[in-house]
Regions:
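Generic signature of intrinsically disordered, low-complexity, basic-rich segments
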Residues: 2-3, 66-68, 112
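Glycine-rich portal/gate segments that line the openings of hydrophobic small-molecule binding cavities
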Residues: 31, 48-103, 117, 153
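Beta-strand/loop substructures that line and gate deep hydrophobic ligand-binding cavities in soluble
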Residues: 94-153
């Protein structure tokens, strides 16, 4: 990982997370009755994001260079996705309307041939209230439930 990219993803020189996180995180997951390849193929396509990630995007995304621009409940955001890979890694950086970058680890983990677990790591940002952290967790839970509904129909 280049130094610039590592810095964008919140990794310090020592390989540890920098001060953009409090060190508190929650793993929120959904089990989906579809292969990991199917889940990854759908979830990694930015054109589908507004269908299942209402907490992030409220309409179609527009590509601008290496990033995507979307309207979110908080205003206009930009999203930088991890390059396509065979490991199920869907990490992304959301740059908030304030300019604050937020790193979001997201994985599609195979569980046999027809099941997968989608795991989102929600990191508590400095200064985030208990109420806001709980609301973020609820939004992620709802987004993963929507992804499950779409892929299992």
């Amino acid at each position: 990982m280049s130094e610039e990219r590592a810095a964008r993803f919140g990794v310090g020189d020592d390989g540890l997370m920098d001060d953009r996180t409090t060190g508190e995180s929650r793993h929120i997951s959904a089990w989906i009755n579809r292969s990991a390849a199917d889940v990854y193929r759908y979830a990694s396509d930015p054109s589908h994001l507004h269908e299942w990630a209402a907490g992030l995007a409220q309409g179609q995304l527009t590509r601008v260079g290496e990033t995507w621009v979307a309207q979110s409940p908080l205003g206009e955001i930009t999203i930088e996705f991890t390059p396509a890979n065979d490991l199920g890694v869907l990490d992304h950086i959301v740059t908030m309307p304030s300019g604050e970058p937020v790193f979001n680890p997201l994985r599609v983990v195979p569980a046999g041939e027809q099941w997968s677990e989608v795991v989102f790591t929600l990191r508590r940002r400095p200064g985030m209230s208990d109420d806001d952290y709980t609301k973020d967790a609820a939004a992620v839970t709802a987004d993963l439930a929507a992804l499950k509904r779409i892929l299992e129909r």
